[in-house]
Amino acid sequence: MVRIRLTRMGKRHMPFYRIVVVDSRKRRDGAYIESLGYYNPLRKPAEIKVNVERAVEWILKGAQPSETAANILSKAGVLAKVHEMKYGKREKSDEGVS
């Protein structure tokens, strides 16, 4: 199974993470298929940079994000874009308004 997850980079006590597409059987910092961006939790606010087009493409192909990666991709707007592409835009209805 192909997963989207984080791989740790940086030096001791100063981590940052790459968001990568990887075979789920590989080790955490092992070889990956493609790098989609990075996440730096030490910056305030946390710095997130993601190639949205490639991330959407991988998710539509069936790549499963890890729980942490899913939270980061959600903040970057990737999961909302995937939902919109799969199911269309949500329409507001006036049925409940009297």
From Swiss-Prot:
Do you know which InterPro entries this protein is assigned to? Answer: Ribosomal_bS16, Ribosomal_bS16_CS, Ribosomal_bS16_dom_sf
Q: Which domain of life is it from?
A: Bacteria
Q: Name one Pfam family in it.
A: Ribosomal_S16
Specify whether RNA-binding is a keyword of the entry.
Answer: no
Q: Name one GO cellular component term.
A: cytoplasm
Q: Which cysteines are joined by disulfide bonds?
A: none
SUPFAM superfamilies according to UniProt? Ribosomal protein S16
Q: Does the keyword Metal-binding apply?
A: no
Any one GO MF term held by the record is: structural constituent of ribosome
**UniProt KW keywords:** Ribonucleoprotein, Ribosomal protein
A GO biological-process term:
translation
Family recorded in the similarity comment: Belongs to the bacterial ribosomal protein bS16 family.
- Which NCBIfam families does the entry mention? S16 (TIGR00002)
UniProt-recorded name of the protein: Small ribosomal subunit protein bS16
State the species of origin.
Answer: Pseudothermotoga lettingae (strain ATCC BAA-301 / DSM 14385 / NBRC 107922 / TMO)
